[in-house]
Amino acid sequence: MQILLVSTIKRRVGIDATASRSRIIYEIASGLVKNGHEVSLIGTADSSVDNVRTIPIIDKGFAELSGFENRFYAETSYLVKLCKKVEEIGSDFDVIHNHTYPELINLFASERIKTPMITTLHAQATSEYDEALSLFPNANLVSISNAHRSMFKKAKIQNVVYNGIDTQAFSFESKKDDYLLWIGRLGATKDENNNFVDAKGAKWAIKLAQATGERLVISGNVEDEEFYEKEVKPNLNDKIQWIGPISREQRLQREEIIKLMQKAKAFLMTINWEEPFGLVMVEAMSCGTPVIGFDRGAVSELVVEGKTGYVVPPSDGVEGLRKALGKISDIDPNDCRKHAENNFSVEKMVENYEKLYRKLIEKM
């Protein structure tokens, strides 16, 4: 098949991409090429996937650029250029797979070309976004978990395809060191009630470490330096450590993250929001590391209670996390690995998307 992947202008796509959306696009593109398809990618000029043709809209990720007179208009203008490019060249392909941020921008183009388009929704299902998507009842929308799908009350979501990871890269390690691991985006964001919250839950991980005396390793990208300075840095000591750059766009290299995941005795998913998937949980389990997470978003869907980790009611707070941690030695790392291999591999993800591509093409 001739397949067009429509990426985001916000960040580049590559093996070293830090954002989950960009990493998934990279894995899909690589997997499709491996299966013999011809793949093109619309996105940033510095995106790089072996044997994939890049069609540039912007030199590099918009998140890295500055100096615009009006940042909103600048980003919107690039999105319009991207949408027009999809409309111009879309008919040259058998199928289009849309991942743009925001995803709905290319739904306008899909109504004006004959080539079928699949749109994978990566974003949180806010009420405004849900309503906007519902204006395209014929769009082929895919969510990334059943929990994610259930968040949309108006939009018609036809299919669910789990994200996949390179299980060979996130390889198995049975021997663990004595530390807990938290990796995520640091920063306060507004919730549905317009209150600022620590969405990824770094503060919960710190509270657990303080309550138990456990060693905690924290890493990720710092989107809000003030949050890091106020909420994280004052708590750092010989037991609670930050590893990696203090940067919005940079974090540890993938190989370094894998090593941390392989040796951690537990990965903490202490989120304060309804996360649609949670790629880091799957990566940790692939390394044989169990997950302890709050029952929000897709956590209970991805983690098998008592077998690959523990799911804690958010209302139980630190005490619930502590109880789960006390049972962590009951988890067999081999079960974590098997669960990741059987359900969340790149091969499985690509196979599921190929089935959807063929199904759409047959309908034409």
What are the residue ranges of the model-derived segments?
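Catalytic cores of nucleotide-sugar-dependent glycosyltransferases that transfer UDP/GDP/TDP-activated
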Residues: 1-364
